[in-house]
């Protein structure tokens, strides 16, 4: 630093002189030769390449939310519903900005950037009076603007302008690909991320629009070309107009029309809709492959995955297994290497719920461990969620699950995790398996890394975690999990509330464990918090409501935690609303409350508990005995005790 500062202070001539003299004295390098400067070819970069390069230099911060959320405690989503709401709200802002740009286009006609950025300018509006030509149509098709392309095509048709067969073919491909429905724009990432879950719920069936523009365009193209056949066949196959797609394929074969490999792939994918039994499906699949061979068509990865998809629909496990073992080596001999989608199909073929146990995932992981993958097939994004499901439900193997997770976090493989639904399934199975197979301390380390910024446990998984904690006797973690349940909005799940209370009541703190020293007080806080939240939920007509068992456990925890005054309030609520509350507290809860009343020298509360027990047909002798022996009762209290249990009991 000192030398650099001194050099900057010297005059330029002195610097040159000093460097040349020192260089002449010390250098041993050969004099530089004039070499031609070669400018490397331009590398195509995406808008986020620089950000990705910077992000790769630092490890992931598990305590921070996803970058799409505001890093602010009040704006970080803490439930799955909030994650979706916050992300879609941000997306709606983009939509609002786009709407303003289109509605008030006169404000956005200027172009500040050089070169101009097309997305910043309002899009062209086409009406019935627009002057259009083939160039306009070609440009819209190249940009994927389906709605405007169809409008311009109709305008050209109405005005009688000729349209070249090549342009009709391009429009046919666009219409067939989208089934003449406007797709979600690429910039709406979050909408596509969350939409997949809704699409999955829709019933799988034919959605192809019969007699629509695609078929009209196809009929206008004369003579029929292989491209026109291919476009319509693929479109019908994609939207499950299966019979007509297969009929068109047969028609093309009869007319000696040479189709391409991807067209055959699309028909192989729908074989399960064309035939019923496994044998019939496998035979049709082989017939299509033989036809490809006769036409000298080389299969590709799409062919392999289409065949495996067909095999995965076989109900007969033995036939499916034999077919998969026959197909995979043949494709490898042809130089077709499987993708993650291929391995996904192998998993669902071999690891069936009602089939024999298969360890095929071990061979798959040995083959692909440590590799980085790129998307090659739409089903590639199904592999990780399915692999983790196999590790948990089929094999129950923690070591395999950790290998899958290591593969997911290799390079950019996380890009292949899929949509929000698949990511949630992946971590649901991963956490459930870890909580069943690891010690509580090790599991909580993984829990801290993943929850809540990467994954928020569903109520079912939270119940699994509570069960594992109960089995391992790690009751000290229950108050913390209750805090998470409050944040994750699980407090309206009655089964979870009862489970938390049961664990705290049934597992008394270990006096020799420092970790459980504060557990009685923490348990009392949990119980009081739960009581107040359920009371609030009842006022708001939420689904959860008090039960006798729940209130009895809350009463017990408050007593054990030294919160006697709050316990009396809870018991007053029990006594006042006993006709509304289903069930009753346990006798042990009443006994502990009476013992606490004895310690607090409150005979009135103890007698209230005894009266409640008598009215609800409990065996009240134990309670009466504790009250009689624990207090020096005055005449009023003694007469009430006699009226409840009788004088004969006191004479014993």
From Swiss-Prot:
InterPro entries found in the cross-reference section? Pentatricopeptide_rpt, PTCD3, Rib_mS39_PPR, TPR-like_helical_dom_sf
What are the ranges of the PPR repeats?
A: 129-163, 225-259, 260-299, 300-338, 547-581
Query: What's the protein name?
Result: Small ribosomal subunit protein mS39
Against Gene3D superfamilies, the record matches this protein to: Tetratricopeptide repeat domain
Similarity field: Belongs to the mitochondrion-specific ribosomal protein mS39 family.
Q: Which GO terms describe its molecular function?
A: ribosomal small subunit binding; rRNA binding
Which biological process annotations from GO are given for this protein? mitochondrial translation; regulation of translation
Name any GO cellular component annotation: mitochondrion
| Alphabetic keyword roster | Mitochondrion, Repeat, Ribonucleoprotein, Ribosomal protein, RNA-binding, rRNA-binding, Transit peptide, Translation regulation
Record-linked PANTHER family: PENTATRICOPEPTIDE REPEAT DOMAIN-CONTAINING PROTEIN 3, SMALL RIBOSOMAL SUBUNIT PROTEIN MS39
The record's subcellular location field reads: Mitochondrion
User: Transit peptide boundaries, per UniProt?
Assistant: 1-37
Q: What Pfam families has UniProt attached to this entry? A: PPR_3, Rib_mS39_PPR
In UniProt terms, what function does this protein have?
Mitochondrial protein that may have a role in mitochondrial translation. Essential for larval development.
Mind telling me which residue stretches traverse the membrane in this protein?
none
Q: What happens when the gene is disrupted?
A: Larval lethal; arrested development at 1st or 2nd instar and failure to molt into 3rd instar.
């Amino acid at each position: 630093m000192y030398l650099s500062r001194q050099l900057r202070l010297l005059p330029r001539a002195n610097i040159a002189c000093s460097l040349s003299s020192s260089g002449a004295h010390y250098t041993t390098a050969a004099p530089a030769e004039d070499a031609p400067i070669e400018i490397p070819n331009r590398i195509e970069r995406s808008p986020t390449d620089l950000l990705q390069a910077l992000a790769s230099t630092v490890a992931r911060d598990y305590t921070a939310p996803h970058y799409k959320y505001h890093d602010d405690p009040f704006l970080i989503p803490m439930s799955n519903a909030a994650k979706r709401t916050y992300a879609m709200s941000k997306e709606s802002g983009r939509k609002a900005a786009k709407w303003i740009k289109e509605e008030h286009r006169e404000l956005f006609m200027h172009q500040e950037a050089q070169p101009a950025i097309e997305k910043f300018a309002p899009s062209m509006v086409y009406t019935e009076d627009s002057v259009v030509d083939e160039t306009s149509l070609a440009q819209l098709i190249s940009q994927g603007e389906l709605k405007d392309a169809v409008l311009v095509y109709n305008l050209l048709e109405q005005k009688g302008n000729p349209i070249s067969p090549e342009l009709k073919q391009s429009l046919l491909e666009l219409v067939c690909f989208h089934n003449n429905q406007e797709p979600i724009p690429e910039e709406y990432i979050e909408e596509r991320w969350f939409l997949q879950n809704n699409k999955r719920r829709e019933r799988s069936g034919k959605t192809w629009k019969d007699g629509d523009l695609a078929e009209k365009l196809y009929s206008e193209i004369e003579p029929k070309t292989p491209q026109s056949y291919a476009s319509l066949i693929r479109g019908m196959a994609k939207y499950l107009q299966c019979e007509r797609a297969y009929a068109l394929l047969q028609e093309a074969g009869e007319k000696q029309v040479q189709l391409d490999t991807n067209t055959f792939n699309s028909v192989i994918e729908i074989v399960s809709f064309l035939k019923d039994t496994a044998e019939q499906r496998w035979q049709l699949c082989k017939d299509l492959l033989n036809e490809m061979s006769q036409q000298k068509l080389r299969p590709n990865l799409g062919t392999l995955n289409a065949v495996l998809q067909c095999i995965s629909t076989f109900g007969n496990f033995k036939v499916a297994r034999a077919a998969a073992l026959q197909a995979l080596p043949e494709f490898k001999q042809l130089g077709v290497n499987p993708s993650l989608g291929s391995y996904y199909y192998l998993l669902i073929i071999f690891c069936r719920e009602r089939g024999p146990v298969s360890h095929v995932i071990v061979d798959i992981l040995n083959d692909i461990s440590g590799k980085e993958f790129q998307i090659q097939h739409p089903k590639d994004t199904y592999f990780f969620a399915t692999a983790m499901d196999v590790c948990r439900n089929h094999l129950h193997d923690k070591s395999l699950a950790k290998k899958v997770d290591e593969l997911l976090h290799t390079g950019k493989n996380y890009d292949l995790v899929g949509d929000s639904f698949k990511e949630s399934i992946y971590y649901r199975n991963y956490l459930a398996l870890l909580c069943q197979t690891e010690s509580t301390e090790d599991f909580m380390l993984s829990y801290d890394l993943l929850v809540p910024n990467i994954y928020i446990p569903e109520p079912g998984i939270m119940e699994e975690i509570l069960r594992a904690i109960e089995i391992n006797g790690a009751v000290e973690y229950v108050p913390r999990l209750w805090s998470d349940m409050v944040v994750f909005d699980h407090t309206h799940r009655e089964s979870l509330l009862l489970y938390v209370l049961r664990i705290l009541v049934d597992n008394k703190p270990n006096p020799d464990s420092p970790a459980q020293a504060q557990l009685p007080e923490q348990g009392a806080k949990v119980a009081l918090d739960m009581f107040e939240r359920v009371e609030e939920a009842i006022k708001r007509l939420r689904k959860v409501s008090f039960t006798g068992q729940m209130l009895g456990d809350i009463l017990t925890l408050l007593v054990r935690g030294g919160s006697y005054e709050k316990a009396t309030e809870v018991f007053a609520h029990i006594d006042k609303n006993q006709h509304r509350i289903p069930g009753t507290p346990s006798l042990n809860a009443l006994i502990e409350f009476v013992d606490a009343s004895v310690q607090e020298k409150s005979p009135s509360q103890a007698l209230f508990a005894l009266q409640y027990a008598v009215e609800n047909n409990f065996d009240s002798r134990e309670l009466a005995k504790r009250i009689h022996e624990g207090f020096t009762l005055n005449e009023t209290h003694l007469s009430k005790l006699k009226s409840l249990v009788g004088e004969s009991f006191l004479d014993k």
